[in-house]
UniProtKB/Swiss-Prot annotation:
Residue stretches in coiled coil: none
Protein name: Probable transaldolase
Extent of the signal sequence: none
Pfam families hit by this protein: TAL_FSA
Species whose genome carries this gene: Ruegeria pomeroyi (strain ATCC 700808 / DSM 15171 / DSS-3) (Silicibacter pomeroyi)
Amino acid sequence: MKFFVDTAEIDAIAELNDLGMVDGVTTNPSLIKKSGRDIIEVTREICAMVDGPVSAEVTATDAETMIAEGRKLVEIAGNIAVKVPLTWDGLKACKVLSDDGHMVNVTLCFSANQALLAAKAGATFISPFIGRLDDINLDGMELIEDIRTIYDNYGFETQILAASIRSVNHILDSARIGADVITAPPAVIKAMVNHPLTDKGLDAFLADIKAADIKIL
């Protein structure tokens, strides 16, 4: 499974990237706005840091302008994936941009029907939003499972990029089901290391070392 980090914070990306935890990055205008910097400037800096795909989102809602924005975004770096919404115009833009040879991440997916359309339109990634489905008492993981089954049935190459990840359990369940990629905030990825028994065991270990006055350096 590939790990994408969902942020525009340069320091957070660098920390995880240094550990080999970053296979890509997802951004959106809201995340970049928090940084207080220019969208092109921030995206270019992220692309220089990370070898994998960096999703940069269009701001338009009509196909023609989405295509124009997408073509401008891919000029930033060769690892840009143009992020478009799962609307009819978004699918039109996806088809054109993918035919041009560019990576496209179709976002805001909430149904298997939508995911099927995105794959047919040539999407590189489909981003089903798990947490937002859970928020309205629907099963986000069931959607991941349905998409996995459909894509496997017909050999679609579109990668399932599980998004709106709220917890480490979302990551684990996505891995069990077979999502190709997850994208999560840095804090959620870092929380994967935590377990109370690890903390308890380390405390006991350190107490034993102190009692025995063991030193290596």
